[in-house]
C-alpha cells in the first residue's frame, strides 16, 4: 500500500493446539482500529457465483442484502474469469469482518483514492507501518501486528502464546471504477520477535 492506495486485509491467526500441523483449530482475528465501531460488520457473509462463461463478471450476494459483481477487466488479466479455479462448486461463501469502504473518486481527475485505516490491517497505509517501505509505490511497505490483539469471536482477548498459521481476507466489499474491486495483496510474513 501507499498513500491513497490501501486495500485493507483482515488478519487471522491460529495456534496448532492439537499439534497435527494442520490449520484445523480455532481462528482468531487480530483486531484493528475499526473493531467495535458501528459501521464495522462482524460475521459478514458474501456468496460468489461461478460465471456461466469465460471473460464474464463474478456475481455476488452479501448477508446485508446487497448484490453486485466483480468486474472482469480484460485489460489487466488474461485468466478466463476471477472465480477461484480450485473451487469445484458453483458458489462459495466467505464469512468475516467487513470494514466501511473508504474509496472515493476525484471528480476533477477521475483518479480513485482508497484511504487508509489507522492500524491493524495488511496492505494498509496506516500508522502501524514498519520503517523501510516506499511511500510512492508501496514496494517494501510492511505493517506490524501484535499477537496481543488476537480476539475471540465475541471480542474478548484470546491470549495466544504464538501463531502457527495466518489467514488474510479482504476487509472491504467495494469497487473503484476502472481500477476494479478493492482487494488485498500480501507478499510475505515475518516473525519480528526473533
Predicted regions and their residues:
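Low-complexity, serine/threonine/proline-enriched polar segments
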Residues: 33-136
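Helix-rich alpha-solenoid scaffolding regions
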Residues: 2-3, 18
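Acidic, glycine-anchored loop motifs typical of Ca2+
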Residues: 17-26, 128
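Eukaryotic short linear interaction motifs
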Residues: 19-21, 37-39, 174-176
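Conserved hydrophobic ligand-interaction patch in extracellular adhesion modules
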Residues: 29
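Ser/Thr/Pro-rich, low-complexity mucin-like regions
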Residues: 137-194
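Predominantly extracellular/luminal cell-surface or secreted proteins
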Residues: 12-16
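Short coil-to-beta strand junction motifs in C2/discoidin
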Residues: 3-9
Amino acid at each position: 500500500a501507499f498513500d491513497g492506495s490501501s486495500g485493507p486485509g483482515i488478519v487471522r491467526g491460529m495456534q496448532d493446539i492439537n499439534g497435527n500441523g494442520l490449520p484445523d483449530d480455532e481462528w482468531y482475528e487480530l483486531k484493528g482500529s475499526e473493531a467495535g465501531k458501528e459501521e464495522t460488520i462482524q460475521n459478514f457473509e458474501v456468496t460468489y457465483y461461478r460465471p456461466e462463461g469465460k471473460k464474464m463478471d463474478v456475481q455476488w450476494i452479501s448477508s446485508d442484502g446487497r448484490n453486485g459483481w466483480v468486474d472482469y477487466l480484460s485489460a489487466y488479466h488474461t485468466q478466463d474469469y476471477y472465480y477461484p479455479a480450485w473451487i469445484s462448486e458453483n458458489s462459495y461463501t466467505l464469512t468475516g469482518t467487513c470494514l466501511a469502504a473508504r474509496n472515493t473518486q476525484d471528480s476533477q481527475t477521475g483518479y480513485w483514492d482508497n484511504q487508509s485505516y489507522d492500524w491493524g490491517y495488511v496492505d494498509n497505509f496506516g500508522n502501524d507501518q514498519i520503517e523501510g517501505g516506499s511511500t510512492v509505490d508501496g514496494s517494501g511497505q510492511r505493517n506490524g501486528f501484535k499477537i496481543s490483539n488476537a480476539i475471540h469471536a465475541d471480542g474478548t482477548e484470546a491470549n495466544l502464546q504464538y501463531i502457527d498459521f495466518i489467514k488474510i481476507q479482504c476487509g472491504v466489499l467495494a469497487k473503484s471504477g476502472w481500477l476494479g474491486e478493492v482487494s488485498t495483496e500480501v507478499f510475505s510474513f515475518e516473525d519480528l520477535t526473533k
